[in-house]
């Protein structure tokens, strides 16, 4: 249950950041949204019990951003300088701090693809 939990969403895009923030508020979470103009983003994120990274910047969320025992959800999808697929979270840096974290690849992207396929089939059947 996320009711009353402190949640920080990094990113304010119309695709992920804003919709996720609204869904979390509807479930009575206390939501803070960070963006490129946020002052002390690391401190703001470190206050979160749940951190949602949707900034579109490869491995920008470092250990300084994550509170001990936080849940980290990485929605980002990026390619780093070496051509490797990665998320917005530096998974190796935060894995022993966070209580749980979704990896990239292999995290929420798989769920997104499944839901998209489900909606596509549903729309096709409705025709």
Labelled PLM ranges:
Residues 68, 73-127:
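Rossmann-fold NAD(P)-binding glycine/threonine-rich loop
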Residues 1-71, 84-95:
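Glycine-rich phosphate/diphosphate-binding loop of Rossmann-like nucleotide-binding domains
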